[in-house]
Amino acid sequence: MLVPKRVKHRREFRGKMRGEAKGGKEVSFGEYGLQATTSHWITNRQIEAARIAMTRYMKRGGKVWIKIFPHKSYTAKAIGVRMGSGKGAPEGWVAPVKRGKVMFEIAGVSEEVAREAFRLASHKLPVKSKFVKREAE
C-alpha cells in the first residue's frame, strides 16, 4: 500500500478541490491512460484495488504506471465521541485528484485489453474517468 515515508505534519487541512489539474494531463510514460473527469480524494486502498484489478486482467502482460500518490493525511474522530477536544487521529492517506489528471498509464498491451483493464479499475475509484491515448508527436 502506498504511504509517505515521513511527513512534516501528521494532520493537514482539508483544502479546496477547485478547477482542473495543473499538470499530468497527458499520457507521458505509457501508450494509454485513465483520465479523471471529476475531482475527488482517492485513498491508498482504492489505488491498490485499481492496480490489482488492472494487473490481474492483463495477466502479467504490459507495464502499469501509477501517476498519483497519497501524500495527504485525513483524520477522523472515533465513533460516539462528542465534538470538540481537538482534531481527530490520522485515519489514512489520500491523493487529491482534480479533473483532467491522468491517474494510471499502461503500455505493452493491445488497445482492447487496455480499455477493459481501465474499465475494471474505474469501478474501484470514486471519480468518473475516461480512456485516453498518447498523442502522436
UniProtKB/Swiss-Prot annotation:
Family of this protein: Belongs to the universal ribosomal protein uL16 family.
CDD domains per record: Ribosomal_L16_L10e (cd01433)
Keywords linked to the UniProt accession: Ribonucleoprotein, Ribosomal protein, RNA-binding, rRNA-binding, tRNA-binding
Its job: Binds 23S rRNA and is also seen to make contacts with the A and possibly P site tRNAs.
PANTHER family the record matches: 50S/60S RIBOSOMAL PROTEIN L16, LARGE RIBOSOMAL SUBUNIT PROTEIN UL16M
Cysteine pairs bridged by disulfides in the record: none
Gene3D superfamilies according to UniProt: Ribosomal protein L10e/L16 (3.90.1170.10)
Pfam families referenced in this protein's UniProt entry, alphabetically: Ribosomal_L16
Assembly: Part of the 50S ribosomal subunit.
BP term (GO), one: translation
Protein name: Large ribosomal subunit protein uL16
GO CC annotations on file: cytosolic large ribosomal subunit
Alphabetized InterPro entries for the sequence: Ribosomal_uL16, Ribosomal_uL16_bact-type, Ribosomal_uL16_CS, Ribosomal_uL16_dom, Ribosomal_uL16_sf
A GO term, aspect molecular function: structural constituent of ribosome
